[in-house]
């Protein structure tokens, strides 16, 4: 098989996970991944075998998502997150499930800029440099957005994310 396709295939699960976090909707995420892969295929001539394929694909996805968001700015800004609990080998305990839902709700309260950086660093395991390359921003900006996002997330978790306060 072609090395280019091997590289694409390797990153599809990561692209899907990030797309689900960005769009908060399974169907929109699948569409975003498909658009990203189509764009990568159409720009195959720009791919560098020795370059960072992951950053290249995530940059494509980020740009498509940003363009779609601008184009659809009249739509509501938030959509409920679907529960992914069915994909775990063992279902989480009720306490862990509630904590996970609270964290997901708090994450959705963050500004997009902070949420994207946190997702790329924490969920995708990207380095600050890779995130900077993916989002087209300076590494220092990544660090400040990450710091502010983590602090805001911590405050939201301490205060209880809207709609998910535990009743005793």
Identify the residue ranges that each predicted region occupies.
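Σ70-family region 2.3-2.4 aromatic/basic alpha-helix that recognizes the −10 promoter
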Residues: 37-41, 51-74, 146, 150
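Helix-turn-helix DNA-binding motif, specifically the short coil turn and the N-cap/start of the second
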Residues: 25, 127, 136-141
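A short, charge-rich alpha-helical start-of-domain segment used by transcription regulators
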Residues: 1-17, 27-30, 41
